[in-house]
Amino acid sequence: MTPRLFALIPCAGTGSRSGSAVPKQYRTLAGRALLHYTLAAFDACSEFAQTLVVLAPDDTHFDARRFAGLRFAVRRCGGGSRQASVLNGLLGLAEFGATDQDWVLVHDAARPGITPTLIRTLVATLKDDPVGGILALPVADTLKRVPTGGDAIARTESRDALWQAQTPQMFRIGMLRDAILRAQREGHDLTDEASAIEWAGHTPRVVQGSLRNFKVTYPEDFALAEAILAAPAHAS
């Protein structure tokens, strides 16, 4: 049986670094909620069985009317961290018939620059891989190490062989669930899914991402994201 594709969008964060009282995923960009662009990209990929959005149980900002016409489901099962929200979402996918051998693509709600082309490139590259992998970009900038709380450069780090992780991150549902459970048992709260897979002893792959698929984090990022979303996506 051919494994099916599911998308999981953890959307339980508060976006404290974005400088807004409204969680960043609900901020308006180019006339639409930031989250809308992510949902629209996956909605355009009809090969996905379901897209599941994981909200915090007490989320009062989500308004389904802002996403009318898009195909997705919502569950209020967000946890205290990204790792916990993803785990709860993985467990929730069983409600839609997902099995351990099906693929899940976990994507940050705050990366509105994702496109159907990027999603399909990731799937086409990894669909026969025993582990899975992530969208990523080779590091282009020179990296400086600075002690926590200081401003003096301790040394320059080599950027050779370094990649900047993006999302979606694509893994088998069972493998990712078990990897996160193992990390939890061993007291680790990891910041992305690939880290959990690595912690479990597997080797994820990287697939070339795009600069447009950056994560909106700081106040100045909103203007940049709006400019990108207003421009044609081309082949990215």
From Swiss-Prot:
A molecular function annotated in GO for this UniProt entry is: 2-C-methyl-D-erythritol 4-phosphate cytidylyltransferase activity
Query: SUPFAM superfamilies recorded for this chain?
Result: Nucleotide-diphospho-sugar transferases
Q: What is its EC number?
A: 2.7.7.60
Q: Where is this site: Transition state stabilizer?
A: 17, 24
What Pfam families does this protein map onto?
IspD
Q: Where is this site: Positions MEP for the nucleophilic attack?
A: 159, 215
Q: Output one GO BP term.
A: isopentenyl diphosphate biosynthetic process, methylerythritol 4-phosphate pathway
Name its pathway: Isoprenoid biosynthesis; isopentenyl diphosphate biosynthesis via DXP pathway; isopentenyl diphosphate from 1-deoxy-D-xylulose 5-phosphate: step 2/6
**Membrane-spanning segments:** none
Q: Which reaction does it catalyse?
A: 2-C-methyl-D-erythritol 4-phosphate + CTP + H(+) = 4-CDP-2-C-methyl-D-erythritol + diphosphate
Q: Which UniProt keywords apply?
A: Isoprene biosynthesis, Nucleotidyltransferase, Transferase
Q: Which CDD domains match?
A: CDP-ME_synthetase
Tell me the protein family, please: Belongs to the IspD/TarI cytidylyltransferase family. IspD subfamily.
What role does this protein play?
Catalyzes the formation of 4-diphosphocytidyl-2-C-methyl-D-erythritol from CTP and 2-C-methyl-D-erythritol 4-phosphate (MEP).
Name by which UniProt lists this protein: 2-C-methyl-D-erythritol 4-phosphate cytidylyltransferase
Species of origin reads: Burkholderia vietnamiensis (strain G4 / LMG 22486)
